[in-house]
């Protein structure tokens, strides 16, 4: 593990400090304090323990490194440069925080090789890492130690541990006994406002211990103490937290230990003083050859480990299944869904779309054995568990269903981690009203382009008596506002099946399924192999020369169809458009959109706010929906009370003809 002397290891750490100082100074912005404070911990971790191969950055059995304290991004960029990642040359370091550079202010997944997750919103990294560590154990249970046997390491700061999401993650990681998860806490006792004591008195080690973690402490500037703590953590069957007592901005003689060094350049004079204090006499952005060689040995060790793993993979009888899962090969799903849709159109079941989702999951999970489901303690309501799914439990990771507990935010972040890890395809459910508890992680799913599926049930006043605390009103508009998120609100069992096909075959877009509690009739009774939901919106009823176009989503589509019948009885030709996914419709060619929407006046209908309907409706068009919060009553009474009815659609249509 350790193959160089202590003095050289210190110089390796000082190379990180120098690059962090210089890059932040050149950018005139950034966070030098954390990289300088945690350089010793990170150097020991990479030099003696962590296994990665920069020449094969996606190697499945690499160790995962998550910089939860993402503001300290120069720590990660400096390490990747020193390790020899091909896309992290010195020009990238010089271009820190500049437009078009891979070295963004906070690490962004996909911008550079080896960045495992986008971090920056504090706490997201540690919670995502729980998902990664869980994925490692689940895959290990499927494929064995020869193919899956690695650690997930996290560097987290005080801010990460103060954020509420970290408590959900700590609880979940400890409960499941994720022994391959090691959190290195940057215990510098500094926040942006000052000493951490001005805002917290918590012994940060205590919550970890209470949740079943193995808790250690070390001097974060004493390499042998750091190494001993990591070694002990690796041996323990529990997840581990190591409190690394550090000095923020270590090496800057006049600023270290203070909050001013957290998020601002040191300045030329302080950098010169730091160079003298550290014994670093090299010009800015210059690393001596022997240090490149020392860091290169780490990369070479990783390459050897990867080559040995490749040999084991070639000889493994599980190779085909492993490679199919790693490639996320979903080719078996579309034909299975097409055949299933034909049965649905013939049988025309009247079921809630949450029930239709459960039915579709029977097809999905049979076609895709690497799909893994779960719910935030609402399995019986979300209906996210299909027949035959086995629960994941502490020490028993061979199953495919995860009980996330009442931890919506932690669930969403963990699903990001499972998806980022690779080899598994996660989905998880909660009530639509609680999407707000998941929102920061949903936003990161979209920002990273990670194909996670969020199952949101009880989608409107249609849930009835639970009342306005549980009735989504503004949620559809706010979720549709997130770029690169496909929000799909299907109207029947056929559209629900199509929505699942879209979600599970997506490669760079998360999907959020919006599902009803109340039963809905099948409106797609004529089978089409084509996935019409993938169009975003389509003509469900075309009367030819239309006088008005009625547009609806989800449970309100049956109201639009009823309104069209009422209008037809009066000799008024109304087209009906089903619009399950605004984002997919916006991506269609302009001529298709024009054909679907037509030139006649339009009326939209959705049991939610009108906000976000500009794609379909102009100021002159009508909308039948909600204008405020809901109420507690049976669903039919609520639809009447809030005037979301076929008659209201007819009235709005006639006013515009």
Curated annotation (Swiss-Prot):
PROSITE patterns: TRANSKETOLASE_1 (PS00801), TRANSKETOLASE_2 (PS00802)
GO biological process: pentose-phosphate shunt; reductive pentose-phosphate cycle
UniProt GO MF annotations: metal ion binding; transketolase activity
Recorded metabolic or biological pathway in which this protein acts: Carbohydrate biosynthesis; Calvin cycle; Carbohydrate degradation; pentose phosphate pathway
Domain of life according to the entry: Bacteria
This protein's UniProt keywords: Calcium, Magnesium, Metal-binding, Thiamine pyrophosphate, Transferase
EC number of the protein: 2.2.1.1
Enzyme kind, highest EC tier: transferase
Record: residues binding substrate: 31, 262, 354, 381, 458, 466, 517
Chain sites annotated for binding thiamine diphosphate: 71, 120-122, 159, 188, 262, 434
Catalytic activity annotation: D-sedoheptulose 7-phosphate + D-glyceraldehyde 3-phosphate = aldehydo-D-ribose 5-phosphate + D-xylulose 5-phosphate
Active site (catalytic residues): 408
Cofactor: Mg(2+); Ca(2+); Mn(2+); Co(2+)
InterPro entries: THDP-binding, Transketo_C/PFOR_II, Transketolase-like_C_2, Transketolase-like_Pyr-bd, Transketolase_bac-like, Transketolase_BS, Transketolase_CS, Transketolase_fam
GO CC term (a single one): cytosol
UniProt xrefs under Pfam families: Transket_pyr, Transketolase_C_1, Transketolase_N
Site description Important for catalytic activity, residues in chain: 31, 262
Cofactor, how bound (note): Binds 1 Mg(2+) ion per subunit. Can also utilize other divalent metal cations, such as Ca(2+), Mn(2+) and Co(2+).
Other known facts: This protein is encoded within the form II ribulose-bisphosphate carboxylase operon.
Similarity remark: Belongs to the transketolase family.
Subunit structure: Homodimer.
Protein name: Transketolase
Chain's gene name: tklB
């Amino acid at each position: 593990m350790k193959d160089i002397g202590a003095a050289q290891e210190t110089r390796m750490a000082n190379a990180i400090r120098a690059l962090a100082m210089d890059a932040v100074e050149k950018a005139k912005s950034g966070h030098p304090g954390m990289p300088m404070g945690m350089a010793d911990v990170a150097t020991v971790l990479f030099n003696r323990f962590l296994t990665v191969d920069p020449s094969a950055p996606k190697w499945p059995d690499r160790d995962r490194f998550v910089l939860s304290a993402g503001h300290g991004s120069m720590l990660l960029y400096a390490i990747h440069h020193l390790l020899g990642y091909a896309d992290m040359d010195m020009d990238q370091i010089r271009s820190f925080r500049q437009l078009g550079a891979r070295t963004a202010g906070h690490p962004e997944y996909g911008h550079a090789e080896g960045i495992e997750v986008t971090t920056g919103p504090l706490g997201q990294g540690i919670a995502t890492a729980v998902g990664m560590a869980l994925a490692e154990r689940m895959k290990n249970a499927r494929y064995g130690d020869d193919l899956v046997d690695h650690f997930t390491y996290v560097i987290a700061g005080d801010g990460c541990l103060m954020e509420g999401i970290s408590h959900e993650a700590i609880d979940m990681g400890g409960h499941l006994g994720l022994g391959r998860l090691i959190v290195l806490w940057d215990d510098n006792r500094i926040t942006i406002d000052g000493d951490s004591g001005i805002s917290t008195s918590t012994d940060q080690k205590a919550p970890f211990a209470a949740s079943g973690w193995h808790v250690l402490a070390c001097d974060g500037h004493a390499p042998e103490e750091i190494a001993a703590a990591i070694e002990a953590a690796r041996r323990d069957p529990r997840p581990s937290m190591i409190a690394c007592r550090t000095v923020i901005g270590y090496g800057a003689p006049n600023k270290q230990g203070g909050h001013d060094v957290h998020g601002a350049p040191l300045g030329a004079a302080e950098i010169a003083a730091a160079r003298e204090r550290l014994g670093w006499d090299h010009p800015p952005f210059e690393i001596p050859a022997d240090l490149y060689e020392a860091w290169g040995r780490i990369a070479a060790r990783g390459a050897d480990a990867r080559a040995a793993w490749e040999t084991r993979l070639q000889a493994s009888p599980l190779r085909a299944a492993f490679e199919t899962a790693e490639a996320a090969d979903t080719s078996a799903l579309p034909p299975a869904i097409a055949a299933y849709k034909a049965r649905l159109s013939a049988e025309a079941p009247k079921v809630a779309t949450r029930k239709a989702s459960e039915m579709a999951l029977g097809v999905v999970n049979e076609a895709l054995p690497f799909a893994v489901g779960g719910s935030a303690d609402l399995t019986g309501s979300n209906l996210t568990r299909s027949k035959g799914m086995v629960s994941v439990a502490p020490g028993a990771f061979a199953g495919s269903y995860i009980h996330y507990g009442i931890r919506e935010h932690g669930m969403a972040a963990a699903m990001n981690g499972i998806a980022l890890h690779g080899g598994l395809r996660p989905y998880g459910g909660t009530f639509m009203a609680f999407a707000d508890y998941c929102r920061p992680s949903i936003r990161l799913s979209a920002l990273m382009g990670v194909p996670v599926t969020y199952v949101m049930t009880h989608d409107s006043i249609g849930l009835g008596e639970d009342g306005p605390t549980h009735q989504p009103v503004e949620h559809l508009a706010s979720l549709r506002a997130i770029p690169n998120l496909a929000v799909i609100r299907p109207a029947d069992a056929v559209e629900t099946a199509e929505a699942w096909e879209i979600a599970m075959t997506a490669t760079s877009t998360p999907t959020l399924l919006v599902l009803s509690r109340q039963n809905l009739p099948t409106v797609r009774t004529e089978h089409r192999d084509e996935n019409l939901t993938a169009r975003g919106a389509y003509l469900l009823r075309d009367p030819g020369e239309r006088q008005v176009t009625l547009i609806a989503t989800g449970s309100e589509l049956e109201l639009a169809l009823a309104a069209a019948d009422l209008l037809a009885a009066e000799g008024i030709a109304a087209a009906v458009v089903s619009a399950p996914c605004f984002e997919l419709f916006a991506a269609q060619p302009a001529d298709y959109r024009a054909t679907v929407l037509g030139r006649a006046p339009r009326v939209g209908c959705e049991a939610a706010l009108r906000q976000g309907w500009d794609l379909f409706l102009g100021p002159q068009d009508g909308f039948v929906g909600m204008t405020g919060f809901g109420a507690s009553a049976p669903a039919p009474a609520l639809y009447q009370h809030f005037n979301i009815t076929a008659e209201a659609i007819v009235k709005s249509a006639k006013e515009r003809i």
